[in-house]
Amino acid sequence: MTELEHLAERVRDAIPLTRHLAFRFAGFDGATLTLTAPLAPNHNDKGTFFAGSQAALLTLAGWACTTLLAEALVKETADIEGPVDVVAVEGNQNYRLPLNDDLTVLAIVTDDDRRRFRERLARRGKATLTVRARALNPAGDTVCEFEGLYLARLGG
């Protein structure tokens, strides 16, 4: 099982709502997390992707990105111990277009934000991270924009 598959399993076990979203963590390169989800379990009465599902998936992508970055710091640094606890502090989304198809989310952390986050988490045992995300349709058009603030704490 890959690290992303293990994280998805942890999420589904801990947050029952996520089982219904049928999401998949499709990739993480240390700066961008990719999440995908099908329309079928997430549609609304108009047959488009439900805004509530989009909000949940965007929030989840930001949480997962923060969690992966914090857990990587723990693995890389001998004198830092886990577990890591991450919570969403703030989140705002702006819906741009209706979505009649499957969804791809790109959750992105800038190099400067990632560096500051790692430094503060290592020094203080807690740190906030801003994650920006875009929900895309299959053509690559942005259907929703999101910005979230997450707090990570070491020691759970």
Predicted feature locations:
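Extreme N-terminal tail/first-helix region
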Residues: 1-16
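Residue-level preference for beta-strand/loop junctions
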Residues: 17, 31, 85-87, 101, ...
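Catalytic strand-loop segment that frames the active site of acyl-thioester-processing enzymes
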Residues: 17-49
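Short structured motifs
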Residues: 19-23, 89-95, 116-118
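Hydrophobic residues positioned within well-ordered beta-strands of beta-sheet architectures
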Residues: 33-35, 89-91, 105, 129-131, ...
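Hot-dog-fold acyl-thioester-processing enzymes
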Residues: 38-78, 82-85
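Hydrophobic beta-strand-centered segment that forms part of the acyl-chain substrate-binding groove
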Residues: 65-112
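HotDog/MaoC-like acyl-thioester-processing domains
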Residues: 98-100, 110-156
